[in-house]
Amino acid sequence: MATVMTAPGLSWQPPDWRDASAYEFTRGLPRGHWAWEFLRLNPGYAGDWAWFNASWKALEAEYGSPPHRDFHRWKSDPRAYRVLTSDLEDSGDEDAVLIECWMGSKWGFYKFPLDPALDAPTIGEQLAWRPVTCAARELASSVVERMETAPGGSPEKLVLEFDLSLPLREQLDSARNLAVARQARLRQSGKIVLRTVQFCAPGWMACLRALDARAAGASVEEASVALLSVEALRTDSYAALLKQADALLNGGYRAILLLPDR
């Protein structure tokens, strides 16, 4: 039997990436649990949680736990706080927040920080994700040029021009109608497929296996043979699969929360 290694920094044993059936638990997962599956594999989160857990236990050892906790002394202890800045790095003593709030702000959730070893936390009770917005953004002219001149273009992207010297209401209404019509045409022609949890799930499952394979020290050859044969996987490159997996691991898990179930 093959030896399954535990990834450095993890306090729990991930599934054996070689065994596709070990990932059957992901079938039918709602978006909130998919996001958790990628967050819990993030080494940064594992490290932050280990620090948080040790700090919390040290505070409890000194000040007690509810209902006998000395809240006044707890909240007067600098160890109960961490500085929150735009880049989430410590810088001075201003804008300090409670360490449980620091964890939630950094990683995108409300509620008490969860041990990455926890399977299937109850969404809304144990884990509540912070709202994620999908905002339009201005593209640099060089990016627009590459998109428009690339072979075949980029059908899922639409670049619109607005005359900012004129009223925007009519222009925005027109832009919405144009985008809706183009989306419908592209879907009908099969050039794009709307991303849903159901549509993306097979690829996400492969991404979880790829992350577990890398953490277990699997060779590129071994992992490629096992993972690139996954039906409905939209890449034939193990490097590309790992790139997708890393994107989900490093913050992309929050974008999952924007997708409809089906």
Report residues per predicted region:
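DNA-contacting interfaces and partner/effector-binding or oligomerization modules
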Residues: 2-182
